[in-house]
Amino acid sequence: SAEKCELEERRALVSMQPKLETCFNTRTPQSVFDMASSHAWNFGWFATCGSQAMKAWNAGNWVLGCRRLAYSDGGNPVWSYVSTGRVIDGKPEKKFVRGLANRRQAEFKECVKGLP
């Protein structure tokens, strides 16, 4: 419902965004902070703060950081896999999900909007 969505959004603003804000070491463009917030809401602020995207943002490379929300530096999709619950060769099996990859691509596009 719309009410539940609004409540969740307020919860994110109050609980997660102040923690996320401490991870940036410089003034952050709004589009970057918005997409970092989306990422943090989905994966946890600690994952976002420790991400390769955050490393790029804190180095002042806004576009690279935004790109890293969707792709590795090698061009492979990231943050687009789910665990299957199986373990193969001692490692958790991950399954690529096209819908998640599409979402990450959309977040990248939003993130770079208006950047210099």
Cite the ranges covered by each PLM segment.
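Long, amphipathic alpha-helical surface segments
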Residues: E3-P18, F46-P116
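Active-site nucleophile-His-acid catalytic modules used for acyl/amide transfer and hydrolysis
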Residues: V14-S51
